[in-house]
Structure formats: structure tokens, C-alpha cells
Design a protein with these regions (language model features):
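Acidic, glycine- and Ser/Thr-rich low-complexity intrinsically disordered tracts
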Residues: 271-349
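Right-handed parallel beta-helix
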Residues: 117-229, 234
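The right-handed parallel beta-helix/beta-solenoid scaffold, focusing on the short coil/turn
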Residues: 21, 61, 74, 87-89, ...
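All-beta strand scaffolds that present successive hydrophobic residues in beta-strands
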Residues: 65, 91, 136-137, 169-174, ...
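Short, T/G/N/S-enriched strand-turn elements that build extracellular solenoid repeat scaffolds
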Residues: 46-56, 71-82, 127, 268-271
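Acidic Gly/Asp/Thr-rich repetitive segments characteristic of extracellular carbohydrate-active
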Residues: 27-66, 334-349
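Right-handed parallel beta-helix/beta-spiral solenoid domain characteristic of secreted/periplasmic
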Residues: 83-150, 183, 315-319, 323
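Surface-exposed loop/turn segments connecting beta-strands in extracellular beta-rich domains
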Residues: 72-73, 94, 99, 144-146, ...
């Protein structure tokens, strides 16, 4: 009798362990009429989002993206706000940067070609829009959009690969992702822009992006800590990080980051009096260390740096980037570059 009882308990436990939604996407072999298993993958992220939004079961969700080019022909909105700190919505690569078999070619490439919509100061296209709390996005490569950014003297076309609008939302972790742009042909206006709380940028690389990340507005209540850590910003043609009056310096961590060959290192929302701390970082080859900004069309007005308490921050030296596409560290720090001790970049181990 004990044997059968034990077997039954094992069966129940195994059923509980698999109570999680998993969907696989392969842009080459997938079909949006498939079941979404690894053997029968979906074709588009849009279809995965549709299914996730319909599933009201209180369970975690993991969406696996295979290598290849994933075109977002419309904004992908996740609005099924059922997740918890433990049971998360995870959007991830099949193979992660720390896996032995990983190479840069294994990264799923997410390209936003969604129709532009009217926005403040021009038109904007949004890629992945998680309007839920407790989300992780990891191991993906995002590119700029093939838009002609200039409209006229007062308007721009802008792309946002990751956008979160809800000012009450919390806990958005972006980790081991690569954001690549080009000011002339594939402009990437902001890699990650998020209202709410708990935006964490971890082990990410931003290469030739106008603005890597904007820690945006919230509803004035309390939430989990926001952070930018172990990340590499190179060639930011506006700034390295943007904080607003809603970005509470006492609830914000900034450490082990490299910001190089960038116009302005740190932009604050115009009028902000918030103070911040930066530790164990390198800021080098910049035009201005700090400035104020007021919107997508504004230039930055240089400001004093007394708002920023810097501990063990290096401001000299040359950052070298690996440009050989055959190398595992492509678009990351080249071997022998200063800053290698900071572990900034895609690899955690």
C-alpha cells in the first residue's frame, strides 16, 4: 500500500512540475497553426502572445525563440497580468550566451517593422510591449528599424524594441540581450523604455543605439528596485542612460557598467533634483558626463555632476570592441581591452 501511495505522490508532484505554459517559435520551420511544442513550433511572436493572453491558468509562461530573424510586423502586447515573482512570463532564446554551444549566430534576431503610429514629436513603432508585471526577456538580439528617422525640423520617426506603458507595473528584467543600431540606416531610438517600477538591465550590450534605456515614469507609489548593472554601452549617439524624476536614486542600483564613445553619459529629465550613485564603472570618450534632456527632439544641456556620487569610476582609457564576427565576443570587449575585469557584457560566467 505504501508503495502505491508513494507512486501516486510522485505522479502528483510530476504533474505539478509541468504546470507551466511553454511555447516554441521558429521563423523558418514554424507554423502558427501548430501546437507550439519544440517539435511543432509556432512561426511568429505575435501568435505566441495571442495564446498567452487567452490562457487564464495561474501558471508561469516561457516562450522560446530559436535562432533566425523574428519580424515583428505589429506591436506584440502581453496583457494577461496574472504572473508572480515566482511564476513569471519569460521570453528567451533557445540557447543562452553562457551555454557551451552558444555563438553570436545562435541569438534570435528581433526586428521591429511594425507600422508607425502618431506619437509625441513624430511617429513611433513599438516592438515587444509587456503590459504585465514579473517579466524576464533574455538572450535576444534587437536591431534598429529601417525607418528614415528625419521627418521635419520638429518631428522624428522612432523605434522602441521593448516598451512598457503601465505606470503601476513592476519587475521587468532584461538580461543578456544585445541591442544594435546605426544612426544612418538602422536607427534604434531607445532600446528599453519602461514606465513603472523594477526595471533591471543586466549583462546587456548596447552598440550604436541613440539611447540604451529610459527609466521612465511611475504612479508615485512604491515598487521594487530598478538597476543597470554589468552592461556595456558603446557608441550611444545621444546618451548612455536616461533617468527621470520618477527614478528614485535611493531605489536604484548602477554598477559594473561601461559607457564609452557616447555623446553624454547620463541624461536626467529636465528639472530633476534626484541624486544617484555609480560604482565600479568606466565612463570614457564622451562629450559630456551629465546633461538634462526634455524629449525625443531635444539636445542635452550640460549640467554639473554633483548629483552623481562616483566610487571607483574610471574616466580615462580606450575601450576596444571586437568586430570579428567569428569570435564569441563579437560586439563585446575585445581581448585585452580595459574594463574586462568588470564582467560587463553578455556573459555571466
Amino acid at each position: 500500500m505504501k508503495k502505491y501511495t508513494f507512486s501516486f505522490l510522485l505522479f502528483v508532484m510530476s504533474m505539478l512540475l509541468v504546470q507551466a505554459e511553454q511555447l516554441h517559435i521558429n521563423p523558418k520551420t514554424g507554423n502558427d497553426n501548430n501546437s507550439g511544442t519544440r517539435a511543432q513550433p509556432l512561426k511568429t511572436v505575435m501568435e505566441a502572445a495571442r495564446r498567452v493572453n487567452l490562457n487564464k491558468e495561474p501558471e508561469a509562461t516561457t516562450i522560446f525563440l530559436s535562432e533566425g530573424i523574428h519580424l515583428l510586423t505589429q506591436t506584440v502586447v502581453f496583457n494577461n497580468d496574472k504572473y508572480t515573482l515566482k511564476n513569471r512570463l519569460v521570453i528567451r532564446a533557445d540557447v543562452m550566451p553562457d551555454d557551451a554551444e552558444w555563438t553570436p549566430q545562435k541569438m534570435p534576431v528581433v526586428v521591429t517593422v511594425a507600422p508607425l503610429e502618431p506619437g509625441v514629436g513624430g511617429e513611433e513603432a513599438k516592438g515587444i510591449q509587456p503590459e504585465v508585471s514579473h517579466v524576464t526577456i533574455k538572450g535576444l538580439r534587437f536591431t534598429g528599424s529601417p525607418d528614415y528617422s528625419y521627418m521635419d525640423g520638429t518631428n522624428l520617426r522612432r523605434s522602441y524594441p521593448i516598451w512598457r506603458d503601465g505606470k503601476n507595473l513592476d519587475d521587468l528584467l532584461i538580461t543578456q540581450c544585445l541591442f544594435t543600431g546605426n544612426a544612418d540606416v538602422l536607427p534604434l531610438h531607445v532600446g528599453v523604455i519602461a514606465n513603472g517600477y523594477g526595471l533591471v538591465i543586466d549583462h546587456c550590450v548596447f552598440f550604436n543605439c541613440k539611447i540604451p534605456v529610459v527609466f521612465w515614469k511611475n504612479n508615485g507609489e512604491t515598487g521594487s528596485r530598478s538597476a543597470m548593472r554589468y552592461s556595456l554601452v558603446y557608441g550611444g549617439y545621444f546618451c548612455g542612460v536616461w533617468t527621470t524624476q520618477g527614478t528614485d536614486g535611493d531605489n536604484f542600483d548602477f554598477h559594473h557598467n561601461i559607457i564609452a564613445s557616447t555623446s553624454t553619459v547620463w541624461i536626467r529629465e529636465k528639472g530633476s533634483k534626484n541624486r544617484y550613485k555609480a560604482s565600479d564603472c568606466i565612463f570614457t570618450d564622451y562629450n559630456k558626463l551629465a546633461g538634462y534632456g526634455s524629449g525625443p527632439l531635444s539636445d542635452s544641456d550640460a549640467t554639473a555632476t554633483d548629483f552623481l556620487e562616483m566610487k571607483n569610476v574610471q574616466t580615462t582609457g580606450t575601450i576596444k570592441i571586437e568586430k570579428d564576427q567569428s569570435k564569441r565576443n563579437y560586439l563585446q570587449l575585445a581581448d585585452g581591452s580595459i574594463g574586462s575585469n568588470l564582467m560587463a557584457g553578455l556573459f555571466k560566467h
